[in-house]
Structure formats: C-alpha cells, structure tokens
Amino acid sequence: MLMPKRVKHRKQMKGRMKGDAQRGASLAFGEFGLQATECGWVDSRQIEAARIAMTRYIKRGGKIWIRLFPDKPLTSKPAETRMGKGKGSPDSWVCVVKPGKVLYEMEGVTEEIAREAFRLAAHKLPVGTKFISRKDGHES
C-alpha cells in the first residue's frame, strides 16, 4: 500500500473538492494515459488494485507510471464506540482527485492493449475516467 513515510499533522480536515485539477492534467511520461473526469477520493488499496489489473493484462510489455499518491489521512472510530471523545485515529490514506488529473500513464504497448488495460483499471476506481493519448494533443 502507498502511504507517506511521515507527515507534519497526523489528522486532516475533510476539505472540499472544487474546480478542475490545476497540476498533473497532461501526459508527462508515457504515450497513453487514464484521466479523471469526476472528483473523488481514491484509496491506496484502489490505486494498487488498478495497478495490478493493468500489469497482469500487459504482462511483460510496456511501462506504467502511477501519477497519484495517497497523502490525505482518513480517520475512523472503533466499532461500538459512543460519539464524542475526540476525532478517531488514522485508518487509511486517500488521494484527492479532481477532474482532469492524469491517474496512470503507459508506454511501450499498442493503443488497443493500452485501452483495454486502462478499461480494466477504471473498473477498480471510484471516479469516472477517460483514455487519452499524445497523438490527440494531450502532452505537457
């Protein structure tokens, strides 16, 4: 699972997801990419599940870049605990995703293989996505 080695503050506020992604909205490494079309929180387990789905499909061909990192802690209180008594302890890590953010990139495979690999990965993610490529003008 992906998570920060250390953080300045153990607990964060929920925050709000407004607007489109300002950074990381264009292809930087690979030929093809998976871009978010909705906002949401992507869990570290979901990031890993999508990565495994892609790597199993492309087998030994190509290279994959993960462009998102879970740096926001989610807290939870134990089961059957009364309300109050402060905020719960950190439970899992999420990445805040806004529309336009490139989630994964890939190169070294054909477009058909990349499309299918990203389709399999998209089923593991809680946000809507679309396939983008450099030849369509999605480069930095």
Swiss-Prot record:
From the UniProt entry, list the residue stretches annotated as the region Disordered.
Answer: 1-20
- Keyword Kinase recorded: no
Q: Please name the PROSITE patterns in this protein's record.
A: RIBOSOMAL_L16_1, RIBOSOMAL_L16_2
Q: Where is the composition biased (Basic residues)?
A: 1-16
Q: What keywords appear on the UniProt entry?
A: Ribonucleoprotein, Ribosomal protein, RNA-binding, rRNA-binding, tRNA-binding
Q: Which Pfam families match?
A: Ribosomal_L16
Q: Does the keyword tRNA-binding apply?
A: yes
Q: An example Gene Ontology cellular component term from the record?
A: cytosolic large ribosomal subunit
- On the tree of life, the source organism's domain of life is Bacteria
- MF terms per GO, please? rRNA binding; structural constituent of ribosome; tRNA binding
Annotated GO biological processes are: translation
Question: Function, please?
Answer: Binds 23S rRNA and is also seen to make contacts with the A and possibly P site tRNAs.
What family is this protein classified in?
Belongs to the universal ribosomal protein uL16 family.
What quaternary arrangement does the UniProt entry report?
A: Part of the 50S ribosomal subunit.
Question: Can you say what this protein is called?
Answer: Large ribosomal subunit protein uL16
Q: Which organism is it from?
A: Geobacter sulfurreducens (strain ATCC 51573 / DSM 12127 / PCA)
